[in-house]
Design a protein with these regions (language model features):
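Compositionally biased, low-complexity flexible segments
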Residues: 1-23
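Glycine-rich flexible loops
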Residues: 29-241
């Protein structure tokens, strides 16, 4: 059945996610590696990501943004405003990935949209992005801004990050200072991520929240949940120290 039939057959509270696809997220890459899909499929998967975050309490107010790539030129992305946990098709737009950074803002594109589009421009393997505001992500991003990173070491949940096969060793999540000029922020993040330790499928904006991604909506969800859990563990461990 198509996306419309799937919507009719499930409750509003049940997010839809496509099944995981074969293959791994790899760098460097010279050809597109995201799963090919239609615009309605990308819109449906975007809605699923947004509703999941809403159910977890990660998008208070009208916070958060979620997107799924359609092809090399376009991505479905939640529009500015509106409760992301209750979003439907009317709250998702199709954005031009290659839009001129110096040009006018695309209609209904949120202030955080440029960060999504910059990630898609930088890496053709990225097929979906989730931006949310888990409490631990917001608190720890401020606390660890001076260090520029949060290190996770010895946690079994590290293995939920694609490419990590053991709890031994460490992985890092970058932390960047916030900037209301999100086009400028996107370029600054882009430059820093070029040399960042892999595997890494996310970053934090200080006092704001987390961006997590993957080659499809399933993997983006997995990384969002994994990083949120790891951040909860670090916050609790620091509280007890």
């Amino acid at each position: 059945p198509g996306p419309a039939a799937l919507r009719r057959g499930r409750s509003r509270a049940t997010p839809f996610f496509p099944p995981p696809r074969a293959g791994l997220y790899r760098r460097p890459i010279t050809t597109p590696a995201f799963p090919a899909q239609t615009e309605p499929q990308a819109v449906e998967a975007t809605i699923g990501l947004a509703r999941l975050a809403g159910a977890r309490g990660w998008v208070p107010g009208t916070a958060g943004n979620f997107s799924v790539r359609i092809d090399l030129a376009r991505a479905a992305i939640t529009a500015s405003g509106g409760q992301k946990g209750e979003v439907d098709e009317s709250g998702v737009i199709v954005a031009d990935i290659a839009a001129n950074l110096d040009g006018p803002v695309q209609p209904r594109l949120s202030a955080e949209g440029p960060l999504h589009l910059q990630l898609y421009r930088d890496d053709p393997a990225i097929g979906a992005i989730a931006h949310a505001h888990p409490l631990s992500a917001v608190v720890l991003s401020r606390r660890h801004l001076a260090a520029g990173r949060i290190v996770f070491e010895g946690w079994e949940m590290q293995k939920a990050v694609t490419g990590v096969t053991t709890h031994e060793g460490s992985i890092e999540l970058p932390v960047f200072a916030n900037d209301q000029d999100t086009k400028r922020l996107g370029l600054r993040v882009s430059e820093a991520m070029k040399s960042w330790k892999r595997p890494c499928f996310g970053y934090l904006i200080a006092g704001h929240g987390i961006y997590a991604w993957g080659r499809d909506a399933f993997e983006a969800r997995k990384h969002l949940e994994a990083y949120a859990h790891l951040l909860d563990l670090v916050l609790e461990e620091e509280r007890r120290a």
